[in-house]
Amino acid sequence: MGDVMSEKIKIFENPKAKLVRSENYNFNFNKQSGLFMRWGKTEDDDPIVGLPEILDIEVSEICHGVNNVPCPFCYKSNVGYKGRNMSLETFKKVIDNFFFFNSEGVSMTPLTQIALGIGDIDSNPDLKDMILYARERGIIPNITINGDRLTDEWVEFFAKNLGAIAVSIYDKDISYNAIKKLTDAGMTQVNVHFMLATESLEKAYEIMNDTKTDPRLEKLNALVLLSLKQKGRGEHFTRLSQEEFTKLVEYGMSNNIRLGFDSCGQQKFIKAVEKHSNFKELEQLSEPCESGLFSTYINVEGKFFPCSFSEGTEGWEDGIDCACDDFDFLKDVWFSDRLVEWRKKLLGNCRNCPIYEV
């Protein structure tokens, strides 16, 4: 990452925590609980741009779906064995390129965690080694799965090495059984991921009710509702209106259901709770789109895009290669003209998605 940031930003780290300190950008990250706090010049100041704190990295495109039925709204349009796997060599190069040497000659990174993107749980034979390498480098690995093909061996490995795991709901029995296996193995950060659209709204209410009644979900951490981006097979789905979204949020909160939302839907969430008694607290806990501001995405080829949904869109028809030698992430990506231009669009749109109507 070069030497520029090592002079201006200090990173302190031990097995329990990572701290970043500078004049205008600071954060505390608890590696054990996942608690994260960020501030600027003062504790009341929110920095506009920082460093990459979270890395979403696609390690496989191969996905047969659940019971060999592809997901009908997959924005990547992944199908069977037609996809590619990221090699372990590429993965290591990408991770290593997020590190820099401080003034004491210690290799450090602002990354707190990586989210591994995969279809079939067993599609990439190097997945375990990738997770172990992230751990070796002091970065907490997380993953999203669909619950299919989850053997006891995978459960044991995930429980030992992941910080958190999300289970997408396609087939309820398969997903709920997977959640129970993972929580029974001692994992406390197990979430449900579910994509919201007009076509999936009824099932969203069904899952919310299940979190209160199905014993397999007794130790579930939260139900995370994801916003529809009309890309790939998702083009054929209908985005939820603000009215429908607000009703859903109100139902969840009134029934004490632990809900979470992706940053793409933050603006809708804020409108949904604007009359709530603890609005200020809810607003403080939510964050709008952070792509290219605090988070990054690397695809299966090792190429950078602001987020996975921006891949192939105008200005990002091709990404920036992050797996090459003699690479400086700060110079070649973080402060590149392309990413600076992206930030202008995102910030100029009040951190609402500049690509999709969410």
Where does each model-flagged region fall?
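C-terminal accessory region of radical SAM enzymes
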Residues: 243-280, 303, 307-358
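Short, acidic, Ser/Thr-enriched surface-loop or helix-capping motifs
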Residues: 31, 47, 298-304
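Radical SAM/AdoMet-radical enzyme domain recognition
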Residues: 88-118, 124-227
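Short, small/polar residue-rich loop motifs at catalytic or cofactor-binding pockets
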Residues: 289-293
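The −1 position to Zn-ligating cysteines in a subset of zinc-ribbon hairpins
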Residues: 62, 70-73, 288, 349, ...
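Canonical Radical SAM [4Fe-4S] cluster-binding loop centered on the CxxxCxxC motif
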Residues: 45-93, 307-309, 314
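N-terminal [4Fe-4S]-dependent radical SAM core
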Residues: 2-58, 279-282
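A short acidic, helix-capping loop that chelates divalent metal ions and anchors anionic groups
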Residues: 80-82, 231-236
